[in-house]
């Protein structure tokens, strides 16, 4: 078996995994600042992907251009949804808020199905067939762009959390909510911004991966599951864990699809997760 | 001046606090003492806006605190150092202090505040880059108080600062607390250690099962038998 091909599979897996990591990071940020499990997380990614499709169909926008529209759009959607719907339910009971995200999952699926039909679709990009040579390995344009963008955004997020006032407020809220309130941190505002940010990350990931991953109205739940698995894999309250988990997930998934086919390949990442949790119940980087 | 009047709070059937009244004058240190579960921490939560009373009033000078959000109450200069420290464990000492100074009044004076608290607690400057969760109990308490001071408090609410500390550390910390009134800070001290609390305050209130059963000048209260019964660390 050709080692080059194996390395290529690994490389592509890691590159895509970086973006999965960002998607999961958004979900983790929402979880640690609000305690809410966003069941509709993957659905919003699907929304972003379909937005890219529409922008292509209507205006021939390349997905890499659509990103500049989908990111602010998803942020605003997230902000409004949290501010007017989720937050009120959170005040009542966290389970009600979780329930509403579950509801959003089905609503989004139905709406997407009505507008776009049930077929699997993907969006082409001008750099779709361009190749970059890294030594003996070949990487196609979309994979490289996705990885580079994910890396840059990852670093920016790190700087946001470490160096800015807002970032400090988020970390404080994560570590001790009561103390954060006593410092004068506006918990509701911070949570709203984090929710918007989580969805903005989906607005980024959607168009970037749509040249590589096809979309149908029903992928929402699948993406949510992936993001959730990565979150748990990395240690549920650990942000770095989500990134590392994403990379590992991309790797395992890519290798799984290379060596196995169809249904068995889909089982590989789940099996890996179960294995890791058996050995380290807190996740890879979580607390024991 | 902080004035709590006839405040009742907690569950309808069995309120945690019943018709509690107390006041804290400007530049004064007053203490609220009593056994565990008597309702002392609930009082702190009420003043800080984390809880609402079912009846009664809480006034800071001319402003009513009831219904204000916790962040508005912090903006007014009423700062709580909560029970159990509640530091941000994975953030450094310096970051914890920085977070203390984030309210609008305190922010412009951040640099000066750092100098002040490092002068009061030099060990914190030494350990500036250390994660707060790795400090010893006494150092954590110092950091918690310092973090409260960074917020430029007019009123400092101290909830059980002596818990888990050795008598020597308690004495050291209480000495610092006593000196705060000279800086124009009024201190409301909630404590189980009655002796230490009365020694550092000018007025005291004894809480028993949700009611104020005794109040007066600290030097007078020391003699009361009810207080003597409740002596901890005595």
Predicted regions and their residues:
Chain B
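ABC-type ATPase nucleotide-binding domains, specifically the catalytic core motifs of the NBD
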Residues: 12, 68, 93-111, 120-122, ...
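The feature captures the beta-strand-to-loop junction immediately N-terminal to the Walker
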Residues: 33-35
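Helix-to-loop junction immediately C-terminal to a conserved catalytic motif
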Residues: 48
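Conserved ABC transporter NBD signature motif
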Residues: 56-64, 76, 109-114, 216
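Conserved ABC ATPase signature
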Residues: 131-135
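ABC ATPase C-loop
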Residues: 148-149
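Conserved catalytic motifs of ABC-family nucleotide-binding domains
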Residues: 152
């Amino acid at each position: 078996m050709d080692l080059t091909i194996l390395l290529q599979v690994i490389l592509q897996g890691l590159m895509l995994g970086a973006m999965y990591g960002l998607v999961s990071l958004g979900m983790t940020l929402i979880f640690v600042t609000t305690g809410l499990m966003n069941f509709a997380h993957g659905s919003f990614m699907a929304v972003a992907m379909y937005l890219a499709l529409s922008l292509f169909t209507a205006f021939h926008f390349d997905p890499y251009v659509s990103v500049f529209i989908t990111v602010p759009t998803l942020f605003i959607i997230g902000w409004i949804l949290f501010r007017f719907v989720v937050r009120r339910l959170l005040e009542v009971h966290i389970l009600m808020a979780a329930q509403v995200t579950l509801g959003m999952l089905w609503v989004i699926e139905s709406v997407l199905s009505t507008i776009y039909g049930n077929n699997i679709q993907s969006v082409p990009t001008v750099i779709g067939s361009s190749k970059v040579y890294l030594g003996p390995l070949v990487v196609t344009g979309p994979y490289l762009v996705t990885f580079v963008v994910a890396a840059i955004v990852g670093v920016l997020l790190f700087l946001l959390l470490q160096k800015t006032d807002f970032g400090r407020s988020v970390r404080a809220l994560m570590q001790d909510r009561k103390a954060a309130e006593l410092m004068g941190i506006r918990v509701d505002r911070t949570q709203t911004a984090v929710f918007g940010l989580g969805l903005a990350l989906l607005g980024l990931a959607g168009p970037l991966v749509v040249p590589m991953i096809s979309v149908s109205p029903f992928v929402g739940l699948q993406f949510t599951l992936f993001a959730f698995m990565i979150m748990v894999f990395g240690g549920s309250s650990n942000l770095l864990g989500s990134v590392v988990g994403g990379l590992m997930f991309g790797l395992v998934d890519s290798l799984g699809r290379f060596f196995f086919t169809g249904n068995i390949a889909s089982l590989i990442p789940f099996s890996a997760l179960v294995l890791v949790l058996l050995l380290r119940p807190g996740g890879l980087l979580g607390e024991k | 001046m902080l004035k709590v009047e006839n405040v009742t709070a907690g569950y309808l059937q069995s309120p945690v606090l019943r018709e509690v009244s107390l006041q804290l004058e400007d530049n004064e240190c007053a203490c609220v003492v009593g056994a565990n579960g008597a309702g002392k921490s609930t009082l702190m939560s009420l003043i800080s806006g984390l809880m609402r009373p079912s009846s009664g009033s809480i006034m800071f000078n001319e402003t009513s605190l009831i219904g204000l959000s916790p962040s508005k109450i912090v903006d007014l200069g009423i700062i709580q150092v909560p029970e159990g420290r509640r530091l941000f464990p994975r953030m450094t000492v310096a970051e914890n202090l920085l977070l203390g100074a984030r309210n609008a009044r305190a922010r412009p004076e951040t640099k000066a505040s750092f100098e002040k608290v490092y002068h009061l607690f030099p060990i914190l400057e030494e350990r500036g880059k250390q994660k707060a969760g790795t400090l010893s109990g006494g150092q954590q308490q110092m950091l918690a108080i310092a973090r409260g001071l960074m917020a430029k408090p007019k009123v400092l609410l101290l909830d059980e600062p002596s818990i888990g500390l050795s008598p020597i550390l308690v004495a050291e910390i209480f000495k610092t607390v006593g000196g705060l009134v000279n800086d124009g800070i009024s201190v409301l001290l909630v404590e189980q250690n009655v002796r230490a609390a009365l020694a550092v305050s000018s007025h005291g209130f004894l809480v028993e099962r949700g009611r104020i059963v005794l109040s007066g000048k600290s030097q007078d209260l020391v003699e009361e038998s009810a207080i003597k019964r409740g002596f901890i660390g005595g």
